[in-house]
Amino acid sequence: MREYNTIFNHALAPITPGPSSSNTCGPVRIGLICQQLLGEIPAKAVVEYYSKGAFTTTLYGMKSDVAFINGLLGKEQNNPEFNAAYTIAKEVGMDVSFAEVDDLTVGGMETVRIRMTDQSGFEMVVIGESIGGGAFKIHYIDDC
């Protein structure tokens, strides 16, 4: 399918399944960069969010959980199967969970630490932050 640059996608905001670009596009993109850094769909992923951060109240209601899973599956935010992320993760054998933690104080209110394990047992940790408008920052990649 051919993609066209449009003012709506590239100047105003990314195409997002909603309800909020910082709660869906940012998390999808964080998950996607994590999957790309790992080099494959993780066998296991734990998405940790700060107990005093924004995801404590928005993770499930704003579909951020679904967005992180889509990214970890290597899918973009405009993927037509966006809402089926949990089912697809199960089908491909990805064990994913979410955990509230007290020790994640780097970054802003929408920061997560994603702990991933690949099929061979290799582990990687990435800390990323959704900063609005579908943009994100990576604060940490395995001691880098």
For the regions a protein language model found, what residue spans apply to each?
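A structural-propensity feature for long, helix-poor, extended segments
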Residues: 46-95
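Acidic-glycine-rich active-site phosphate/pyrophosphate-binding loop
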Residues: 1-8, 39-44
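Glycine-rich beta-alpha junction loops
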Residues: 50-54, 118, 132-134
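Accessory carbohydrate-recognition regions in carbohydrate-active enzymes
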Residues: 26, 30, 34-39, 46-50, ...
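A conserved regulatory-domain signal marking ACT and ACT-like small-molecule sensing domains
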Residues: 67, 129-144
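Conserved phosphate/anionic-ligand binding catalytic regions in large, soluble enzymes, centered on
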Residues: 12-33
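C-terminal edge-of-domain segments
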Residues: 90-129
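N-terminal loops that bind phosphate or other acidic moieties
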Residues: 18, 29, 36, 67-68, ...
